[in-house]
């Protein structure tokens, strides 16, 4: 083990998790009187289309959830990416 590896530690597990799963959180303040638009199904379909251009995914691999917390709406998008076997 090299000096730098001992000093900073190995982040192999974290890198694997990040590679296999992408999570995105978006929060915005919702004002009163703004009509609610049900965009989640369309968003999920479009995410599948875009991500499928780069990696093979199906609709079960993408979860979209909208949560309300006080005056904020939190949009959570979880994408499970397929594992890639890389010989190193």
Curated annotation (Swiss-Prot):
**Its function?**
Prevents the cell division inhibition by proteins MinC and MinD at internal division sites while permitting inhibition at polar sites. This ensures cell division at the proper site by restricting the formation of a division septum at the midpoint of the long axis of the cell.
One GO BP annotation here? regulation of division septum assembly
Species, as recorded:
Aromatoleum aromaticum (strain DSM 19018 / LMG 30748 / EbN1)
Q: Which family does it belong to?
A: Belongs to the MinE family.
Fetch the HAMAP family from UniProt.
MinE
NCBIfam families assigned to the protein according to its UniProt record, in alphabetical order? minE, PRK00296.1, PRK13989.1
Q: Which domain of life is it from?
A: Bacteria
Positions of disulphide bridges: none
InterPro entries referenced in this protein's UniProt entry, alphabetically: MinE, MinE_sf
Q: Any idea which UniProt keywords this protein has? A: Cell cycle, Cell division
The protein, known as: Cell division topological specificity factor
